[in-house]
């Protein structure tokens, strides 16, 4: 059993052959989320994977109401084992936005952002953690199209992207959907720069 200790919490990863192991992108999103989240907030993490980011928030903030979604059944079990309430579903599909409890102050997403051709797909469930489609933005664009319906007035999203994903393209998409987009964190890692973009409803 692999474990990672970070931000006052020890995360159990279980079978890392099927679950994305938290790395620099996970750490950067967790750090950004800790700065953005406040006590009393309703928070949703989409595609929570092992539950790393959610578990860090739960360990460091009091009185938050946190829900997560995850499509990979192995990762969903891992997130539950780390104390995260998780619904196994694709993005927002298992959540009904018309219910008041399903409107959130803050939504987090670390999407698969690697441009991926059919030949580059990873076998099995782990592909969901890496495969961003040909543009690297396919899953992110689906998320952005739906996110607004799940936010409270003035709500915010935090998304982790790579310089490979195309920062300006992402900001333009967010702007077209009624978000004010700002970069709140960035970190150079080997061949890419990791970037956390905040979108605030206008």
Enumerate the language-model features and the residues they cover.
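Auxiliary N-terminal substrate/complex-recognition segments of SAM-dependent methyltransferases
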Residues: 1-202
């Amino acid at each position: 059993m692999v474990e990672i200790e970070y931000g006052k919490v020890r995360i159990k990863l279980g079978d890392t052959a099927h679950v994305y192991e938290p790395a620099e992108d996970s750490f950067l999103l967790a750090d950004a989320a800790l700065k953005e989240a406040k006590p009393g907030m309703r928070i949703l993490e989409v595609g929570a994977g092992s539950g790393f980011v959610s578990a860090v928030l739960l360990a460091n903030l009091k009185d938050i109401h946190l829900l997560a979604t995850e499509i990979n059944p192995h990762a969903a079990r891992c997130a539950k084992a780390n104390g995260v309430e998780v619904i196994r579903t694709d993005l927002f599909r298992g959540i009904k936005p018309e219910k008041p409890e399903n409107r959130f102050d803050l939504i987090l997403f670390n999407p698969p952002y690697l441009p991926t051709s059919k030949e580059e797909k990873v076998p099995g469930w782990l592909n969901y953690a890496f495969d961003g489609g040909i543009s690297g933005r396919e899953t992110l664009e689906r998320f952005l199209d739906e996110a607004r319906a799940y936010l409270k007035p003035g709500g915010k999203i935090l998304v982790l992207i790579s310089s490979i994903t195309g920062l300006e393209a992402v900001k333009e998409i967010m702007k077209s959907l009624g978000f004010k987009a700002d970069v709140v964190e960035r970190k150079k890692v080997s061949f890419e720069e990791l970037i956390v973009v905040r979108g605030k409803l206008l």
